[in-house]
Curated annotation (Swiss-Prot):
NADP as UniProt keyword: yes
Catalysis: reaction(s): 2 oxidized [cytochrome P450] + NADPH = 2 reduced [cytochrome P450] + NADP(+) + H(+); an organic molecule + reduced [NADPH--hemoprotein reductase] + O2 = an alcohol + oxidized [NADPH--hemoprotein reductase] + H2O + H(+); dodecanoate + reduced [NADPH--hemoprotein reductase] + O2 = 9-hydroxydodecanoate + oxidized [NADPH--hemoprotein reductase] + H2O + H(+); tetradecanoate + reduced [NADPH--hemoprotein reductase] + O2 = 11-hydroxytetradecanoate + oxidized [NADPH--hemoprotein reductase] + H2O + H(+)
UniProt enzyme class: oxidoreductase
A GO cellular-component term linked to this record: cytosol
Organism: Hypocrea virens (strain Gv29-8 / FGSC 10586)
Family from the record: In the N-terminal section; belongs to the cytochrome P450 family.
Domain annotation Flavodoxin-like: ranges: 504-645
The protein's name in its UniProt record: Self-sufficient cytochrome P450 monooxygenase CYP505P1
Gene (UniProt): CYP505P1
Binding site for FMN: 510-514, 589-621
Length: 1076
């Protein structure tokens, strides 16, 4: 390659080659990687080689790699071994090309499965198989010669298959014989490497090898298909592993799923790439530990200090920084995925002098990059874990350590591999001492697609002696895995202020009441850490008055990118605050949101944080973040305050009081029994009267929907589409369960004192029935903190262990996903005794619920109706017969004459009904109870028609399951016959026959079928309204964008995608109200 005219460019070095084959004769087919390294090492940080007619560039310095990792200039390409593996796994995550659609779909579906919470959830399965390995070595005895890579291959393959697919290879129960899948996989990887090193014409002559390759591929895919078929046949499974995500998951962006072939592609990708690299890491780690006895002893001491002799638990893993550094240093010296290949779509210059032509493969050889002496020093080839400890690792230049690849195409399973490796090495160091079977062994490398030690053997001896049976009992013991609580915890009486507690201010911005409930939970926790909440208030209450004498904690959410109603004034004030005007304010922000609203996710919390900084306020803890799509908000708040807030503002020499759960056992909320009192309510709520309550569905319907008609008091008004806030009452069944658990009668009088952060009237008597019905969320899933309190109160060690597991490893599956409440746990463990005040302190305050009003004030200005789905479904927690929605069951149980406490709230933004119905065509799209606001719109249209207004056309697209839940059918038919509206329906679970304007399918299908109607209205200037679930709204939006796109003249939009083109209409002609 000749340098271009630019005088600063130099030619990239290259070795001498032969005609036709170039440098191909230098490559050893048994060791292609290291023969390549040997060839290019003398050529410097960059070189070029030709293999036949193909030009390749290779880099070996961190300085050049740092430029290559810029994804705006260079992207991963699939060549060499990966290209050959496409015959086996096609466009799986590892081998897909950047532009392939299946990669995008699979990546978005699988990212949540490999999140931190999900990986922690897999810990029990990982530990199960690690124990099988340990038992094998214990049973074979200290003279048994261990084939290290073979046993680690068994372990990592079994672990990956069990954790991600619920399939057991049972590799430790088949003697020395590996599962046939392993033989097929090893041959396939080797064949892919050989094919990549040979020209295509030579590969075409290797008929026997090709037939073996085809046979192995067919066997592995058949095994995966069998696993899929078995899972599909298990209709009662509630698994949430990788296979479940592949089978049931839908792309959150497009709504698409994956075919069986694509699922098999990704199953094989994870089984092949995932277990091979991790088994290599474990093998190399054991080699380096044995070759460096002092390092092994230091790692073992760390494991012993953290575990304190108890079995390794998931919470131990984050407390092993030195062992983590051992694994990082192992991957630096021996990256088991030894490189990746990039290219650029256009000519690029790197290092200021090397021209990289467009579309030329650039190989990154990590075994050379990771030994760059300019970064790692003259001892770069030595094994020194200290250089990988956090304080040193964080000082490395960017992109100095890349064993998991780069950027968007980096390894999705990094967290899985890290947890697995940490667990296994920690258990091995805790259980055994080791020695090399051959003391003179020198490291040799075996290459396939990955690298592993070749012929590495060792011996293992139980550290504490005894028999394998003794060791098995030890492994399976139920020793405590958490911090040990004192049997006589110190108890402090609650204080609302003064004394030795310091004040803080808690402010919240929330429309739905979630951040408000979080604020009161935070206030309750504050008393455990030396603080009391002097003020708990909406953000608007702090406009112009942020205190400078105490910490301020702000909890906020975004609503279509805007602040909540009770934060608007504060937000506007903050936007105009002058520089340094808030100097002296000490604050931190916790943001709530949902990732499906990508464009505005966490926007308001981030802006509040930035604006406070700009005005001179000082952040005492980094902003907390909770994503309700994948997180429990109460759990994330608990984590954030425990890890960041309380340590930052603690009053005692910067040390956090960690005995909060112990204190809660004795209860900070003191309860006395006295006389009843009159109900006190939220000041902004008014008393309304139920006029009618009726079912909208037949007894044959799946799920129940209700219509509730409410008489509003004088002076309360609303507009079509506005919301009604409702103060609910807990279902009597749940209240009775609490009374039974604490042996109380419904009319027992209670009086609470001592903790004003718990949102109930203090020093006021009321019946316990009233207290439980009106003030607390009884069905809220328990948080890990709640469960730890129960564990601290438990006297039985086995019960403590079970609860500690529920608070950690199995929390997501057994608590959050099953909606297991604190009450459920107290019923499950009746032997646990906690004070009634403790129970109340742990519960969140009862929240207001928000409903769309389903009527127009033109129909009756003093009446408002609600249309709602009643949540009453089988409980997933054993012992709890039903899971009941709090507000929906309360409303469904009301009868004419019942009183209810409500408040109207204006709808914000562009969801307001058009002001002039004679000029603005309207398109309404709804599913189920999402019809509510549009019934109000239609009533308003009918009223105006009756008063002589010539209505612009309007259409309603409505989806439901069947004719049994076709809401307001006769009413809508009457409106349609009078020309108020055109209605197009979709039944998802009933054949429609010849019914007019009705389709089998979902509301999206009806919209697609009637696209001409939509386009005609759109071209006439229609505004589109959508109301329903997140999934429905997302799919409808994509469809609407495509319909609008195709309706526009091609020369106007040809440079844009449908979604890009549609953005120009989102703030003026498209409005969505989404219920989660």
């Amino acid at each position: 390659m000749k340098p271009a005219k630019n005088p600063n460019l130099v030619e990239i070095p290259k070795p001498k080659g032969l005609p036709v084959i170039g440098s191909l004769h230098h490559i050893d087919l048994e060791s292609p990687l290291f023969s390549l390294i040997e060839l290019i090492q003398p050529l410097g940080p960059i070189c070029q080689l030709t293999f036949g007619s193909e030009l390749n560039i290779f880099v070996s310095s961190i300085e050049l790699l740092n430029e290559l990792c810029d994804e705006s200039r260079f992207q991963k390409i699939v060549t060499a071994e990966l290209e050959k593996l496409r015959h086996v796994v096609h466009d799986g995550l590892f081998t897909a090309r950047n532009e392939e659609r299946n990669w995008e779909i699979a990546h978005r579906i699988l990212m949540p499965v490999f999140g931190t919470i999900k990986i922690r959830e897999m810990f029990p399965e990982m530990k199960d198989l690690a124990q099988q390995l340990c038992l094998k070595w214990a049973r074979y005895g200290e003279e048994y010669v261990i084939d290290v890579t073979a046993d680690f291959t068994r372990l990592t393959l079994d672990t990956l298959a069990l954790c991600t697919m619920g399939f057991r290879f049972n590799s430790f129960h088949n003697g020395t014989v590996l599962h046939p899948f392993v033989d097929s996989m090893v041959r396939t990887l080797k064949e892919a490497s050989v094919q990549a090193a040979l020209p295509n014409f030579i590969n075409s002559l290797r008929k026997k090898s090709w037939r073996r390759y085809e046979k192995d591929t067919a066997f592995m895919r058949k095994l995966c298909q069998d696993i899929i078929d078995k899972r599909k046949s298990q209709t009662d499974t509630d698994s949430h592993d990788l296979l479940a995500a592949l089978l049931r998951g839908r792309d959150p962006k497009t709504g698409e799923g994956l075919s069986d072939d694509s699922i098999i592609d990704n199953m094989l990708t994870f089984l092949i790439a995932g277990h091979e690299t991790t088994s290599g890491l474990l093998s190399f780690a054991m080699y380096y530990l044995l070759a460096n006895p002092q390092t092994m002893e230091k790692a073992r001491q760390e494991v012993d200090e953290v575990s304190q002799g108890s079995p390794i638990a998931v919470e131990h893993l984050s407390k092993l920084p030195y062992l983590n550094a051992v694994l990082k240093e192992t991957l630096r010296l021996q990256p088991t995925a030894p490189g990746f290949i990039l290219s650029s779509p256009k000519d690029e210059i790197i290092g200021g002098k090397y021209l990289i032509p467009a579309n030329i493969p650039i190989g990154v050889l990590l075994h050379m990059v990771h030994l760059d002496k300019a970064v790692y020093g003259e001892d770069a080839a030595e094994f020194k874990p200290e250089r990988m400890l956090d304080e040193n690792f964080n000082k490395l230049p960017p992109n100095s350590w890349k064993p998991f690849g780069n950027g968007m195409r980096g390894c999705i399973g990094r967290a899985f591999a890290t947890q697995e490796a940490l667990l296994i090495v920690a258990m091995l160091l805790q259980s055994f001492t080791f020695e090399m079977a051959d003391p003179g062994y020198k490291l040799k490398i075996k290459e396939t697609l990955t690298v592993k030690p070749d012929n590495f053997r060792m011996k293992a001896k139980l550290r504490r002696g005894g028999t394998a049976t003794d060791f098995q009992r030890e492994l399976q013991s139920l020793g405590s895995v958490g911090a040990k609580l004192s049997s006589t915890p110190s108890v402090t009486s609650a204080q609302t202020g003064g004394g030795d507690k310091k004040p803080l201010t808690i402010l919240y911005g929330s429309n739905s009441g979630t951040c408000e409930a979080l604020a009161y939970r935070l206030a309750s926790d504050a008393t455990l850490h030396g603080f009391y909440a002097r003020k708990i208030a909406p953000l608007n209450a702090a406009r112009n008055s942020l205190p400078k004498s105490e910490p301020v904690i702000i909890l906020a959410a975004s609503y279509d990118g805007l602040p909540s109603d009770n934060a608007e004034e504060f937000f506007d004030w903050l936007n105009t605050a002058e520089k340094d005007s808030l100097k002296g304010v000490s604050y931190s922000v916790f943001g709530c949101g949902h990732r499906d609203w990508v464009a505005t996710f966490q926007r308001v919390p981030i802006l509040i944080d930035d604006l406070l900084q700009r005005a001179g306020a000082e952040r005492f803890a980094n902003r907390g973040l909770a994503d309700s799509a994948v997180m429990d908000l109460f759990v994330e708040l608990e984590k954030w305050t425990t890890d960041s807030v309380w340590p930052a503002i603690s009053q005692t020499d910067g040390k956090q009081d960690n005995d909060g759960e112990g204190k809660l056992i004795s209860s900070l909320l003191k309860v006395e029994f006295s006389q009843p009192r009159q109900l006190q309510q939220y000041s902004h709520l008014v008393e309304a009267t139920v006029m009618e309550s009726r079912s909208l569905t037949t007894p044959s319907a799946i799920g129940k929907k209700m219509h509730v008609d409410i008489q509003l008091p004088s002076g309360v008004s609303y507009h079509p589409g506005d919301h009604l806030l409702v103060l609910p009452v807990n279902p009597i069944r749940n209240v009775k369960r609490v009374l039974s658990r604490f042996h109380l009668t419904w009319d027992t009088i209670v009086r609470a004192s001592g903790n004003e952060s718990v949102r109930i009237p203090i020093e006021t008597a009321m019946t316990v029935h009233e207290l439980l019905s009106s003030y607390f969320e009884l069905a809220q899933p328990a948080t890990p903190r709640d469960i730890r309190v129960l564990a601290a109160a438990a006297e039985d060690e086995a019960t403590k262990q079970v609860l500690n597991n529920l608070a950690t490893t199995s929390y997501l599956e057994d608590i959050q996903e099953k909606k297991t409440s604190l009450l459920d746990l107290l019923e499950k463990f009746p032997e646990i005794s906690i004070a009634f005040g403790t129970y109340l302190t742990l519960l969140p305050s009862l929240r207001l619920r928000t409903y769309s009003i389903s009527s127009s004030p033109s129909w009756n200005s003093s009446r408002a109706t609600l249309t709602l789905s009643v949540l009453d479904e089988p409980a997933t927690t054993p012992g709890s017969k039903r899971y009941l929605g709090v507000a929906s069951n309360h409303l469904a149980g009301l009868t004419p004459g019942d009183l209810i406490h409500v408040a109207t709230r204006p709808v914000k933004g562009i969801f307001q009904m058009p002001a002039d119905l004679s000029k603005a065509p309207t398109i309404m799209i709804a599913a189920g109870a999402g019809l509510a606001p549009f019934r109000g719109f239609i009533q308003e249209r009918a009223y105006q028609q009756q008063n002589g207004v010539q209505l612009a056309p309007a259409a309603l697209f409505f989806g439901c399951r069947s004719s049994h839940d076709d809401l307001y059918r006769s009413e809508l038919d009457a409106f349609e016959s009078s020309g108020v509206i055109r209605v197009f329906r979709a039944y998802s679970r009933e054949d429609v026959g010849s019914k007019s304007n009705t389709r089998k399918g979902y509301v999206q299908d009806s919209l697609q079928a009637e696209k001409d109607v939509f386009v005609q209205l759109w071209n006439a200037g229609a505004k589109v309204y959508v109301c329903g679930s997140v999934k429905m709204a997302s799919q409808v939006k994509d469809l609407v964008a495509n319909l609008v796109y195709t309706a526009e003249p091609m020369d106007a939009q040809k440079e844009f995608t449908p979604q890009e083109w549609f953005k120009r209409f989102e703030k003026t002609r498209y409005a969505a109200e989404i219920f989660t």
